[in-house]
């Protein structure tokens, strides 16, 4: 089945031309990984820390929502956990006293089992309170949107002071492209596609620079560009510390 090739993010298709030389193919550079991230919780945007074109590192805060309501929920959950912890300790002490009486023969088996049941309930209530606290803390953490990996900021739809609804049909996002790793896309005929198996070492040439690359995958179906060129899409990954813009032409020297 033939299909139109599109950029990694679904942008408009750009032509890639196969050349006659058997040892080199022309292609273009794409982002190795391009993702849209959002906060995961809803709230008013308190701060935006990045702008398009900026380089960010993994864990860097991109956007902050107003945390007040989430902080209140954490304090409530922490108080509830402390209360259930105290009740659990008291129930544990009661059970130990009842166990001592049972060992002396002063308490029936039925009464001891009732104490065991009360202790089990106290333990379960405390466990649930701990989970509620962890959940509240997790939601508080989500008010600070962080970069999942080293990246370039492509664009952001967050607006300072606006309400960001995470469950909206089109929620506010920051679009990131992985920094340091790139993909070269090219078309190959069937014979060459059979040669370029995953792991094959190649050389990628971009603007006079050479990079060691590796074939990441080869398409199983032919692809047709908007210019009518047909072939099998080959993806090659390579590393570069410098920015290489998506859509930049490249050449790939084959083994």
Q: What is each stretch, according to the model?
A:
Residues 25-26, 30-52, 58-62, 147-152, ...:
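Short, solvent-exposed beta-edge and connector elements
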Residues 49-50, 55, 67, 157, ...:
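Exposed loop and linker-edge segments at protein-protein interfaces
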Residues 158, 218-224:
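Short, conserved beta-turn/loop elements at beta-strand boundaries and strand-helix junctions
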Residues 16-17:
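N-terminal signal peptide c-region/cleavage motif recognized by signal peptidases
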Residues 22, 49, 54-147:
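Amphipathic alpha-helical coiled-coil/rod segments that serve as protein-protein coupling scaffolds
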Residues 172-220, 230-241, 251-252:
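Short, well-ordered beta-strand segments in soluble/periplasmic domains
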Residues 2-9:
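Bacterial N-terminal signal peptides that target proteins for export
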Residues 32, 40, 131-163, 180-181:
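Elongated periplasmic alpha-helical coiled-coil
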């Amino acid at each position: 089945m033939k299909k139109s090739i599109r950029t990694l993010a679904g942008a408009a298709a750009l032509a890639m031309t196969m050349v006659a030389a058997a040892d080199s193919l022309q292609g273009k550079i794409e982002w190795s990984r391009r993702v849209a991230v959002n906060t995961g919780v809803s709230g008013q945007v308190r701060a935006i820390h990045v702008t398009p074109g900026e380089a960010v590192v993994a864990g860097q805060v991109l956007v902050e929502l107003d945390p007040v309501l989430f902080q209140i929920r954490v304090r409530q959950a922490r108080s509830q956990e402390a209360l259930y912890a105290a009740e659990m300790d008291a129930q544990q002490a009661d059970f130990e006293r009842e166990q001592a009486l049972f060992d002396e023969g002063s308490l029936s088996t039925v009464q001891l089992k009732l104490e065991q049941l009360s202790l089990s309930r106290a333990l379960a209530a405390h466990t649930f309170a701990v989970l509620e606290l962890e959940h509240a803390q997790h939601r508080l953490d989500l008010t600070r949107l962080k970069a999942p990996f080293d990246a370039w900021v492509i664009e952001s739809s967050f607006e300072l002071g606006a309400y960001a609804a995470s469950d909206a049909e089109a929620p506010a996002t920051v679009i990131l492209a992985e920094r340091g790793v790139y993909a070269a896309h090219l078309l190959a005929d069937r014979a060459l596609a059979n040669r370029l198996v995953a792991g094959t070492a190649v050389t990628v040439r971009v603007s006079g620079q050479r990079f060691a690359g590796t074939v990441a995958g080869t398409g199983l179906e032919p692809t047709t560009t908007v210019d009518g060129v047909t072939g099998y899409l080959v993806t090659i990954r390579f590393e570069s510390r410098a920015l290489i813009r998506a859509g930049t032409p490249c050449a790939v020297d084959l083994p």
